[in-house]
Amino acid sequence: MGNWAVNEGLSIFVILVWLGLNVFLFVHYYLLYDTSKEYIYTRKLLGSALALARAPAACLNFNCMLILLPVCRNLLSFLRGSSACCSTRIRRQLDRNLTFHKMVAWMIALHTTIHTIAHLFNVEWCVNARVNNSDPYSIALSDIGDKPNETYLNFVRQRIKNPEGGLYVAVTRLAGITGVVITLCLILIITSSTKTIRRSYFEVFWYTHHLFVIFFIGLAIHGAERIVRRQTPKSLLVHDPKACAQNISQWGKIKDCPIPEFAGNPPMTWKWIVGPMFLYLCERLVRFWRSQQKVVITKVVTHPFKTIELQMKKKGFRMEVGQYIFVKCPAVSKLEWHPFTLTSAPEEDFFSIHIRIVGDWTEGLFKACGCDKQEFQDAWKLPKIAVDGPFGTASEDVFSYEVVMLVGAGIGVTPFASILKSVWYKYCNNATNLRLKKIYFYWLCRDTHAFEWFADLLQLLETQMQERNNAGFLSYNIYLTGWDESQANHFAVHHDEEKDVITGLKQKTLYGRPNWDNEFKTIASQHPTTRIGVFLCGPEALAETLNKQCISNSDSSPRGVHFIFNKENF
């Protein structure tokens, strides 16, 4: 239990608080609508569907308030950089913003389903009462408001000949129209957010997600018509529903039971969402302002394995290791922004990203930069680029640990390029305040060509550490996870050479996948009383494996070895 609490304790606490608030709101509003005196006649008309519609509505307000906050990147980056208010543990929760965003989205979907189904029953009860297809009590309640100076309870006011006509009345009211629109928006947003769509058809995901604007507008005005009604406080003073409920035929005839008066609840949703919507509007204004700032592409480098490197400059741009930016290329798409990890170091006078060509947008950028041509491209022909960021990630905390494990899979090595470059610069500048004492670096890749663009950096580090008699500072293991028989024979022939046949490094390339259990146990034995940061940029399956290893290999004792798992999320 202690091992688990080291990595997941605070995250689970946050989730439990969030779930607890959802349960509290649901129960509180369910009991309010199911037991309070002012809703006695509304319950007579609608039954338990009233409370089952209003309780999830309260939870929807709460979760729609939360859904925008995890995607306010500038706000999160500001909080992350405020070390005075954010410890490492708190920052790790900020790094899980997208996970929380998805959880809130699924909670919204759940409560939307309950709310919609309950209101479909409510519409049926209201319509049946107006076509005289209900009990006499409901019909009598629905007739209130037909006479002058009376306020109505049933929102269906006209007499209806058949239930289908009543359904038409319901969906043509403001609440019905907005309900249909925001539900359709929610369905489209969620279905286009699956992993398959995001990876293979990112443009579909990107454009569909912007339906959130319509969703929030519809949500804000959804309750403006006030169709869910209750007995007014003034009416309750002269008409006690507990005493008069059984004497409906005497209403208006005896002094103690005058005709009850009803009013709709004032809309509340806008009060929940106006704050987050204002913050998100500020977020978008900041992004727009940044997108207008001039960015100059100083160099484009084509690497093997269909990877390009863009080196850029922008006035006032400041970065930290492991951060990422959003990039827009109007020549490819005027609206799309794509996230990329910075591969340059803060000490360099430019910032760079490495982009693997895997989709329509990256293919378009590849061609716009002239990388599909053999001749050099003139600088003035390079496309205009807009940059938003940089934004903080888990990798920023690398220098907060004495010992770290860096694990990159394929192109996922990019954030560690920035870290290792920064380490190299710090050693070149004789940095004395470097807390980091040991790096264990693991790189898993399927293809030998993918190693080429990164090998030069590792060679520089390897040489630098040897010259400073600190060769043990960096321990790196490169794994080739895909090879054929001819490659295996070639590797075997050159195995005894001083340098590796693939990378040119003294450290030989390993074949297959790491035995993570052995790796963690070995590192734990070498650093028995240390908090070790484990940083991953790679697939979910690997993240799950490493997270389990961090939990199982962390000591339950506060003074023992603790592996702290961190994963890149953007």
UniProtKB/Swiss-Prot annotation:
One of its GO terms (cellular component) is plasma membrane. Keywords: Cell membrane, Electron transport, FAD, Flavoprotein, Glycoprotein, Heme, Ion channel, Ion transport, Iron, Isopeptide bond, Membrane, Metal-binding, NADP, Oxidoreductase, Phosphoprotein, Transmembrane, Transmembrane helix, Transport, Ubl conjugation, Voltage-gated channel. NADPH binds at residues 411, 446, 481, 513. The keyword Oxidoreductase applies. InterPro entries: Cyt_b245_heavy_chain (IPR000778), FAD-bd_8 (IPR013112), FAD-bd_FR_type (IPR017927), Fe3_Rdtase_TM_dom (IPR013130), Fe_red_NAD-bd_6 (IPR013121), FNR_nucleotide-bd (IPR039261), RBOH/FRE (IPR050369), Riboflavin_synthase-like_b-brl (IPR017938). It is a multi-pass membrane protein. Residues 79-219 form the Ferric oxidoreductase domain. Heme b 2 binds at residues 115, 222, 226-227, 268. One of its GO terms (biological process) is defense response. Its main location: membrane. Glycosylated. It is found in: Cell membrane. Residues 287-397 form the FAD-binding FR-type domain. It catalyses: NADPH + 2 O2 = 2 superoxide + NADP(+) + H(+). Residues 2-9, 73-95, 195-203, 286-570 are cytoplasmic. It comes from the Eukaryota. Catalytic subunit of the phagocyte NADPH oxidase complex that mediates the transfer of electrons from cytosolic NADPH to O2 to produce the superoxide anion (O2(-)). In the activated complex, electrons are first transferred from NADPH to flavin adenine dinucleotide (FAD) and subsequently transferred via two heme molecules to molecular oxygen, producing superoxide through an outer-sphere reaction. This is NADPH oxidase 2. It comes from Sus scrofa.
